[in-house]
From Swiss-Prot:
Keywords: Cell inner membrane, Cell membrane, Membrane, Transmembrane, Transmembrane helix, Transport. It comes from Escherichia coli O127:H6 (strain E2348/69 / EPEC). It is a multi-pass membrane protein. The MdtABC tripartite complex confers resistance against novobiocin and deoxycholate. It comes from the Bacteria. The chain crosses the membrane at residues 25-45, 347-367, 369-389, 396-416, 440-460, 472-492, 537-557, 863-883, 888-908, 911-931, 968-988, 998-1018. The gene is mdtB. Part of a tripartite efflux system composed of MdtA, MdtB and MdtC. MdtB forms a heteromultimer with MdtC. It is found in: Cell inner membrane. Pfam families: ACR_tran (PF00873). GO terms for cellular component: plasma membrane. Coiled coil: none annotated. This is Multidrug resistance protein MdtB. GO terms for molecular function: xenobiotic transmembrane transporter activity.
Amino acid sequence: MQVLPPSSTGGPSRLFIMRPVATTLLMVAILLAGIIGYQALPVSALPEVDYPTIQVVTLYPGASPDVMTSAVTAPLERQFGQMSGLKQMSSQSSGGASVITLQFQLTLPLDVAEQEVQAAINAATNLLPSDLPNPPVYSKVNPADPPIMTLAVTSTAMPMTQVEDMVETRVAQKISQISGVGLVTLSGGQRPAVRVKLNAQAIAALGLTSETVRTAITGANVNSAKGSLDGPSRAVTLSANDQMQSAEEYRQLIIAYQNGAPIRLGDVATVEQGAENSWLGAWANKEQAIVMNVQRQPGANIISTADSIRQMLPQLTESLPKSVKVTVLSDRTTNIRASVDDTQFELMMAIALVVMIIYLFLRNIPATIIPGVAVPLSLIGTFAVMVFLDFSINNLTLMALTIATGFVVDDAIVVIENISRYIEKGEKPLAAALKGAGEIGFTIISLTFSLIAVLIPLLFMGDIVGRLFREFAITLAVAILISAVVSLTLTPMMCARMLSQESLRKQNRFSRASEKMFERIIAAYGQGLAKVLNHPWLTLSVALSTLLLSVLLWVFIPKGFFPVQDNGIIQGTLQAPQSSSFANMAQRQRQVADVILQDPAVQSLTSFVGVDGTNPSLNSARLQINLKPLDERDDRVQKVIARLQTAVDKVPGVDLFLQPTQDLTIDTQVSRTQYQFTLQATSLDALSTWVPQLMEKLQQLPQLSDVSSDWQDKGLVAYVNVDRDSASRLGISMADVDNALYNAFGQRLISTIYTQANQYRVVLEHNTENTPGLAALDTIRLTSSDGGVVPLSSIAKIEQRFAPLSINHLDQFPVTTISFNVPDNYSLGDAVQAIMDTEKTLNLPVDITTQFQGSTLAFQSALGSTVWLIVAAVVAMYIVLGILYESFIHPITILSTLPTAGVGALLALLIAGSELDVIAIIGIILLIGIVKKNAIMMIDFALAAEREQGMSPRDAIYQACLLRFRPILMTTLAALLGALPLMLSTGVGAELRRPLGIGMVGGLIVSQVLTLFTTPVIYLLFDRLALWTKSRFARHEEEA
């Protein structure tokens, strides 16, 4: 067994000890680079790990979900399905709207995905309906990603149509141009239009049809090229009064003549300025408004984007009339900044606690100043590297630096403690620094690279979780590496200049009392260690028991994915009976809004009713509830949600589903609850059979709550069953029937009014105020081949049926999504297992496939790779330690400390009521790196004592344990206090930080107590094993 010998001449530290000016200037350069880097780093909630996502929206007013699916969604899906790099394609086809969400592989640049989407849309153009009002529009945005900012525009003096027109032309377009903005949506549906409401009885009495009126309007309002005249000396451009701009002009339009008398549009219709879609509405609190939601592009920095919007807003609002009020209702960056500020405060607190524990142990101001300089220098220097790596200041990188506080101080402590030992023995400070730094240099290198080795597996984690923690791992590794450099350069140089026998021996009353206390603790530890060494097998059984206990705890501890954060914003979905109309839904929504706004934690509320890119049907409404800042309300978001749901339960005929918005968004669709599970089949019939059965089972599970499905197949349909023979005999085609129905009930966009600033539509429909419901179909008239007027009822029968309100696809096949939450007394792991067990009992046919989606799918993936991740971390550390020690045995001795860390972390999580989520798992992996430091410091000195002083293994490890007890205790407490602010955090984003702190504090406490006794015992056992192995080999060689 060979060990690399430590240098007695200062090793790599010698040059820096002997050149203090150069060392000081080098450290100043690192400090300045870090400060400049800190100022240049962007701020965000989490690392940018979004999947490249593009949403394609196609609007076809009046089309049923079935028509939207077959005529619009399917042709587009076929083209999109051929794109390379596509990870998942989901679509939702509802009345008048098709929304397709395309999620690409993480490695595909968003700009490349955009080019492929545009090419696919172009290829599908010829397959789409010819009367589609507008071509498909794509946006580089994830629809499930909550808006970064929500603004409400209201006015007490102007109609909403004029307000929306101004907002669209003067505000929304400018905000859309800001870098990082992916989509600006205006909810409220008050876009100006000229609405033509036909009087069915009037046109029937005159022998006219709606098609006659439509043809007259489209022919009277045109905007096309007319050419120019080019004479010998002058050129003249041709123009004409071919455009009609106002409702009054349309009223005067002559649509036909009877007996030589003109029939004007105003004679048979009500023509008025109105909204393009009367089945859309938005409210801010209790006031009707135009709600502007700003969503970012995937990968864009949310803070800089929001800052740019706020800088532009005053300029934009100045262009609006004074009666128009623009209010910022929600800004996600407010909570993000608060969370980052809290994490920065916890970082400073960790530094202060670490410096305090150093002084408590060293009891010497100069000796305390040295690590007090090394710690912030290592952390600040990390910022410079983060800039070059395109990182950001976010919760995870700041958590990495907070944890690094306990790590980076370890190196400085080890160096100072070793140099101080030689100074106290009477050596000169310079000689002691050279000798102490040279002796400890190999230990520092071992500690550093073995700790970085633990982080290596995090860099190779796949999918979005790996991307998420890459910044965390690299930031921590860089801080540790800079710390090692500082500890081998600045720290010994400062020790040589600042420490002396007089300063170290200078004691006050506190120093003397604490020194006596430490001496008593070391003496007690020595007595206990001697007893333990005399009973090695009992100690070994304790070590094996911790290994078994850690495995049992791992199996039984509740498991989750990502902590649920309180960001102060709640997303809500309001569900009413499937036959609800727009007016009915708007009334129910206002009732619910009144209840919600009475809650003391609610600051504001926006709501939307109607069908658009995020809301699939008229019987549902979207809500965004903005809570007061955390310090202004008594309860956190989960309690507020429970209270709101209880209050809304008293409103009859509606179901409310609420979930808090999260910084990490993996889903690609707006969901009712936090977690999703999908059923996919080859036909809608198969889904209609099995979805109700599965829903019934899942709603009975105690592990699930708020179980709901987007399967809605009880929408009322008036099925027009045309007698094709009769229609053909009269010369009426099915196209004529469809056109007549579309003209009457589809809010048909029949013409466009062009202005210098915008384009507006002419909307055709029947006035159904006097003939509500199915009776309106009796007023439909068609033109026969001989010019006569034929009632629809003479060639068709009307049947009332049920049909889906929306048709959803996943990768081109019908799918339904089951959403659910997890009750407080269960974990996501419990819920996932319960769903899988239930699925098995149903014996689903082979043509139905099930899959978890979004964060639930990511949880499954992360859970499956967690064990391998920890194994990889242990293997990586073993390889590094084996190379450093040139031994197969000593790395095993060092790694034997790991089960104690696992037991402590898991027990702490159980006691605190926290789940084992990905944050806690990262803490356990870091514990692997921290805990083994104790063993490294013991074994390094034991091997040196055996080699240089000829001690027996037992005496060597005994002396090493006593000699290194103080620095071991100091470094462990430093790491513990570095994690303590995270464990005790209560501010914004505390849910994210607390599991890491809990796991690390618990693991450090238990491992500190156990490893001080188990490590020396295992060292001796492996030493005996090595001797026995050598003797066996020697005997075999002699016999040979």
